[in-house]
């Protein structure tokens, strides 16, 4: 029995419509902080911006799309967001 041909999903750069989801503590200015950090590293499409709070209000999720240029850029974005101390997860 042969194994199915499974291709890994690689991102082709540049990717003009790369979705980013940032989850963090609900604090005043969280959305603006996310936009500021992302804008330092990539072109941000603010038309795709969505913000949502968790049921209990403890966490906030900010979603938007960026122009992703490279794996290094995505790594730098992740590092910069995590360095804020209020970001819990970047997807």
Swiss-Prot record:
NCBIfam families associated with the record: PRK00341.1
Protein name (record): UPF0250 protein PputW619_0619
Top-level taxon of origin: Bacteria
Example of a GO cellular component annotation carried by this entry: cytosol
Origin species: Pseudomonas putida (strain W619)
SUPFAM superfamilies linked: YbeD/HP0495-like
Source taxonomy: Bacteria, Pseudomonadati, Pseudomonadota, Gammaproteobacteria, Pseudomonadales
Recorded family membership: Belongs to the UPF0250 family.
InterPro entries on file: UPF0250_YbeD-like, YbeD-like_sf
Pfam hit, one: DUF493
């Amino acid at each position: 029995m042969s194994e199915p041909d499974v291709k890994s999903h690689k991102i082709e750069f540049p990717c003009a419509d790369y979705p980013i989801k940032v989850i963090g503590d609900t604090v005043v200015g969280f959305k603006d902080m996310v936009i500021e950090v992302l804008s330092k590293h990539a072109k941000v499409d603010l038309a795709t911006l969505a913000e949502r709070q968790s049921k209990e209000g403890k966490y906030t999720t900010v979603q938007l799309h960026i122009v992703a240029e490279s794996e290094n850029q995505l790594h730098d974005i992740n590092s910069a967001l995590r360095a804020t101390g209020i970001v819990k997860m970047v997807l």
